[in-house]
Amino acid sequence: MILTITLNPCVDNTFWVDDWDSLPVKTERQSGGKGINVARVLTNLSVPCLALAPAGGENGALLRELCQSERVPLVPYPIRGETRDVDTWVRRRDLEQRVDVHPSPEMTREECAGFEDLALSLLDRARAVAVCGSACCERAAQAGRRILEAAKERGVFTVLDSNKTALAVCSEAKPDLIKPNQKELAQLMGRDVAPEEEEEACEALLDRGIGSVLLSMGAGGAVFRSRGSQPVRAAAPRVETVNAVGSGDSFLAAWLHAWTAGASSRRALEWACAAGAANAAVFPAARVTRREIQEQAGFSL
C-alpha cells in the first residue's frame, strides 16, 4: 500500500464562464490537494493506496463526500478549522484560467500530534509514504517532516513532492525520493538554476543526503538522478495542453505505479512523463487512466 499525506487539502471548484464578467454556465467540483490527486490516479492504476488528510468544517464534510464519489480512499483526520476552497475560473473560448486560492486553516498543536499518530499507525501497512503539496501551517509542515523521519526509521520508502514552507521543512528529513519541478529546484538551491545547471543541482541534493531526485520539467520532460548512477532523461510526449493542473501529481502517481511494478528507471520515467502529458490534454485534473497513459507512452505496465 502507498500512503499519501496531504497537508493542505481543498475543495476544487471550477467555474466555466463565457467571459470574466459573466455568471458561470457550468460548475464542477472535485476533491483537491496533491496527495489526494496522487491517490486518485493510483486508484485508477489499481495500486492499493490510502490518502490521509486533515478535514474540517462544511468543506471537510464535502471533501469526504467528493472522495467517496471519486473512489479516492480518503482517511480524514478531523480538525476545527475549515478546509480551504480553490476556485478556478475557465473562459470557455480559449481555456484561459484565473485562480483564487482561499485561506488555509490552522492546525493546533494537539491536532498535529493526533494527525502524526494516525499517520504512524498507517505506516505498518505501507510500502511507501509520499508527503505532497503545501502545508496549511508551519505546524503541519513540521508534522510532515516527523512523519517522513519515522517512516525512514521503519524502512518505508519516503517521497516528498512539496513546495514553499513544506518543501523547506520536510526536505530536512532527507527523503528517499524528492520530486521538484524547476521552480522548486530553485527554492531548494536558494538561487535560480539554469537548464545547463540542473543535473549539477540534482547532484547537490544527493550530497545533502537525499536518496534520489525526480526532476519534472513539464513539456521539457524529466530527469531521474540517484547516487552511483548516471542521470536518466525522458522526453514528454507532445500534446495540445488543455489544463496542466494535476500533471505533476499524475506524473508522480505513474512513477510510483512503475516503482511498485519493478520497472527500470528509464521505463518508470517514460511512464511518468506519459501520465503528465495525458493529464495536460484533458479536463478535469488528475483523473488519467491506464489506457490514456498507455496511448501516450506507447507501452503498458
Regions found by a protein language model. Give the residues of each.
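Conserved N-terminal subdomain of the carbohydrate kinase-like
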Residues: 20-21, 44-127, 295-301
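Short beta-strand-to-turn element immediately C-terminal to the catalytic PLP-Schiff-base lysine
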Residues: 17-18, 90, 223-227
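Structural motif
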Residues: 1-3, 97, 127-128, 212
